[in-house]
């Protein structure tokens, strides 16, 4: 039983470090995107394809 605890503990420890690094990277990206122009561009990127699909669906019928 003790032989299983060591690898599991190691995996847990490495996974925790990995998640911590991912959170730091994500927070850094969010800080970079805090500029209003970039935020508006990102909203437009999400919104325009949806509108395009709706219009093509309506005009195609």
Curated annotation (Swiss-Prot):
InterPro entries on file: Frog_antimicrobial_propeptide
Q: Which positions correspond to the propeptide?
A: 23-44
**Which GO CC annotations does the UniProt entry carry?**
extracellular region
Please name the Pfam families in this protein's record: FSAP_sig_propep
- This protein's source sits in the domain of life called Eukaryota
Q: Does the keyword DNA repair apply?
A: no
Establish whether keyword Signal is in the entry.
yes
**Disulphide linkage map:** none
Signal peptide range equals 1-22
Tell me which UniProt keywords the record has, alphabetically.
Answer: Amidation, Amphibian defense peptide, Antimicrobial, Cleavage on pair of basic residues, Secreted, Signal
Q: Where does the record place the modification Leucine amide? A: 59
Q: Which GO terms describe its biological process?
A: defense response
Q: Where in the cell is it found?
A: Secreted
State which tissues express it: Expressed by the skin glands.
Q: What's the stated role of this polypeptide?
A: Antimicrobial peptide.
What is the name of this protein?
Answer: Temporin-MT3
Tell me the organism: Amolops mantzorum (Sichuan torrent frog)
């Amino acid at each position: 039983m003790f032989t299983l605890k060591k690898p599991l503990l190691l995996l847990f420890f490495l996974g925790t470090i990995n998640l911590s690094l991912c959170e730091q990277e994500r927070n850094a990206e969010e800080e970079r995107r805090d500029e209003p122009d970039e935020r508006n561009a990102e909203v437009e990127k999400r919104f325009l394809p949806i509108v395009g699909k709706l219009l093509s669906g309506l005009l195609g019928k």
